Amino acid sequence: MKVGIIGASGYTGSELLRILANHPEAEVIAASSRRYEGQKIWKVHRFLKGFYDLEFCSPELSNFGDCDLVFTAVPHGEAMKYVPQLLDSGIKVVDISADYRLDKETYERVYGKKHEGYVEAVYGLTELHREEIKKANLVANPGCYPTGTILAASPLAKLELIERVVFDCKSGITGAGESPSAFTHYPNLHESIVPYKITEHRHYYEMVQELGRFQSDIKISFTPQVYPGSRGILTNAHVFLRGELTREELYRIYEEFYEDSFFVRIQESVSLSQVRGSNFCDISIHPGEDRVVVVSAIDNLVKGASGQAVQNMNLMMGFDETLGLRTPPLFP
């Protein structure tokens, strides 16, 4: 299977290259970067020396014509320039940008941008939409925060047990992207945790969309924060239930919901160090007097982005969804 990556020089693109380097069925034949066009991949991503001798190309679609599937790992507003033409050429697409995660009207309102060439996609949270993904030509890879939050709350939302849920999320700095800024500057983040886009983060609308499929009247609050680490998203989901459930009942609900999901592990406790560098989402459940706290941990670059994209690629191309991804986390 021949694959391409449009936008391969950033963190998400380089993580795709890392994962695909050892995929037994995938060969990367084209990887684009406007900034590094003509340079060897390993000269830009030095950790990949010995794995790729390919040069970065331009994002012109002629460079991707021989691909069976293309990943678009570009900023929102850019993927829509490529996706319709790729689909028209018979090439399947996993879009890692935000361009196809929401319906057209919501996207234009939330992102403040007219959506040119809108095509309906399958939302690529694999554990929720596995069968639809198998038949899809276009999969919209979820955002990193929605991956951790939706997986944390879905088992209870499916049973319509949630009165309201408060998502308190902390993300590593790679979630802000590769481009340096005052926000990501070392002195501003060192020994600090910084909340941002409070009540305004665009990922909120993915949570509403997906959890609303289970429970239309669910009430959601979401506060993202950045901590001075490179990878990982820890979500504390404060779930206020309709009725009471014992610890045993809660764990049974989660274990049954995810019994066929290799990459979701129900644990007694979780931490970011237990999932680093892997495609796992670890979840623990902690009932209290007035709420249940569900904690989820993911690597934002893997399960929160490139790993889940490869998981979706596997299903789209008829492979086992774990192919090339059965890698234990890095520990310590």
Curated annotation (Swiss-Prot):
It is found in: Cytoplasm. Keywords: Amino-acid biosynthesis, Arginine biosynthesis, Cytoplasm, NADP, Oxidoreductase. GO terms for biological process: L-arginine biosynthetic process. It catalyses: N-acetyl-L-glutamate 5-semialdehyde + phosphate + NADP(+) = N-acetyl-L-glutamyl 5-phosphate + NADPH + H(+). Its EC number is 1.2.1.38. One of its GO terms (molecular function) is N-acetyl-gamma-glutamyl-phosphate reductase activity. The active site is at residue 144. It comes from the Archaea. It holds the Pfam family Semialdhyde_dhC_1. GO terms for cellular component: cytoplasm. Its main location: cytoplasm. Pathway: Amino-acid biosynthesis; L-arginine biosynthesis; N(2)-acetyl-L-ornithine from L-glutamate: step 3/4. Belongs to the NAGSA dehydrogenase family. Type 1 subfamily. HAMAP family: ArgC_type1. Catalyzes the NADPH-dependent reduction of N-acetyl-5-glutamyl phosphate to yield N-acetyl-L-glutamate 5-semialdehyde. This is N-acetyl-gamma-glutamyl-phosphate reductase. It comes from Archaeoglobus fulgidus (strain ATCC 49558 / DSM 4304 / JCM 9628 / NBRC 100126 / VC-16). The gene is argC.
